[in-house]
Amino acid sequence: MAATSLVGICRRASAFLKAACSLVNPKDAAHSGCRSSLSLLHKNTPHVTSFLQCKLLHTTLSRKGLEEFFDDPKNWGEEKVKSGASWTCQQLRNKSNEDLHKLWYVLLKERNMLLTLEQEAKRQRLPMPSPERLEKVVDSMDNVDKVVQEREDALRLLQTGQEKPRPGAWRRDIFGRIVWHKFKQWPIPWYLNKRYNRRRFFAMPYVDRFIRLRIEKHARIEARKRSLQKKKEKILHAKFPHLSQERKSSSV
């Protein structure tokens, strides 16, 4: 687009020079106009090539405006829209940080477009075409965030040896729960800090009974989940006995 605008400016400049030269010497107007236009094009040729090279690096359309918040007009009125699978962590680990940065903004634009489409479908009380596209985009963005966090953690472990981005320690609060306490800088020493000294990183003896009850509750919930899973497996075995036999034969 920049190259075409530059060519248009060159054409207007050549036409202006032709008109000026025709006023001075009508006979030499055509020759001087051609020479001036050729000289302008010759001077601006590297700029045109540089503009073309810059255009190849762009990934979005300029002067698109608010149209990017809406779906492609080809998909308007369609009940189903074809879409690919979401990006997995294994695929994203093979990409560079620059590619992940570009992909994040592409997914962000796609998510904004799908959210606009979802809101418009709710307003018109119509089903959204292919709502799984939004789930795939959200999963892809979560995977990109996860891969970037993995790289940051690996770099921090290499440089400082710390697992967490902010240093801290595992401590027990007054309710007997083990929590991660984040360290922070204070302008005064800890033994002079009244706010810090009001915090209790220990549990009193009467809390032990409630700790035991909490552990029993958690164990009871896990046992209930396991029994429910076994009941579901028994129902499936009774409903599809041939599959259970094939599984036993394959395991043997």
Swiss-Prot record:
Keyword Ribonucleoprotein: yes
Disulfide links within the chain: none
Pfam families the record matches: MRP-L47 (PF06984)
Skewed-composition ranges (Basic residues): 230-240
InterPro entries for the chain: MRP-L47_sf, Ribosomal_uL29_mit
UniProt-annotated stretches for the region Disordered: 230-252
Modified-residue entries (N6-acetyllysine), positions: 146
Single biological process term from Gene Ontology: mitochondrial translation
Subcellular locations according to the entry: Mitochondrion
Swiss-Prot/TrEMBL keywords: Acetylation, Mitochondrion, Ribonucleoprotein, Ribosomal protein, Transit peptide
Gene Ontology CC terms, in alphabetical order: mitochondrial inner membrane; mitochondrial large ribosomal subunit; mitochondrion
A single GO molecular function term of this UniProt record: structural constituent of ribosome
Family (UniProt): Belongs to the universal ribosomal protein uL29 family.
Record text on subunit structure and interactions: Component of the mitochondrial ribosome large subunit (39S) which comprises a 16S rRNA and about 50 distinct proteins.
UniProt protein name: Large ribosomal subunit protein uL29m
The species this protein was found in: Mus musculus
Source organism phylogeny: Eukaryota, Metazoa, Chordata, Craniata, Vertebrata
Gene from which this protein is expressed: Mrpl47
